[in-house]
């Protein structure tokens, strides 16, 4: 999640129609954790790499990147920084000169131990709403959402949430490959299909995202011919959004992918695991989300912000 993505989330409400989905709850918890971050994404990736190398040398930089869910280009930059600080050693693989063997140095072990304490303290703070037993259970359930080969490499609740969130998002989007759609399109399309016409501001409130974020989202749907943006006949200062016939057709495609993803998640978590994880994630969100979003986004509300569509800034929702 980038900085522009994280500011798309609005603490305070949760859309009831989306809270059944583990992937959605993970996204909100990940956004909540990211919003209170002390460091940067690069700090998180560096810790993951150091922790992975603590148990063994790694014979393929590319393989480690894939196991940790880190883009290969970003992985090169992470290793460059760690190597420059003397925390990681990168040497040619004698069995394959095209690959590098990654090793943790003594300095790297010291840096890892120092970070472990900080990570543990941060996890305690982020999961303060849970008992120690609940947090242990949360970590175990989150690990089930990761590939078996990755599970031993990712430690700490914050990192498990991030990895599970990214994996489910990719898994869902892979189901829509070739359609031009993303799992994130389900929320706005399903809301607009139910409540139409709908003002742009009301859609933002219903989805609990910022105005700039919903503008970017709607722009994307309008460009694809899935949503029509017109003026509200009752208030010319506002936009009235409607799903097109093509949008309804594509909503069916996205809905099937979302259902398939939910079934996959249920299988990964095992009997009772889905309800248990949903409850634990809900507890983490309870402190910052006071209640459900409005059930009808079509209710009229004043909106000065929508009167100047050209002033929007881009803030993608993932």
Question: Predicted regions span which residues?
Answer:
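N-terminal leader segment of winged-helix/HTH proteins
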Residues: 1-40, 128, 132-179, 303-307, ...
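Alpha-helical structural segments
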Residues: 24, 28, 32, 54-55, ...
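N-terminal helix-turn-helix DNA-binding core of bacterial DNA-binding proteins
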Residues: 24-27, 31-74, 79, 85, ...
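Residues in the helix-turn-helix
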Residues: 74, 99, 213
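Charged, amphipathic alpha-helical coiled-coil/dimerization segments
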Residues: 81-136, 217-279
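Intrinsic, low-complexity N-terminal interaction/targeting segments
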Residues: 183, 205, 210-212, 216, ...
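Ser/Thr/Pro-rich low-complexity tandem-repeat tracts
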Residues: 290, 295-303, 310
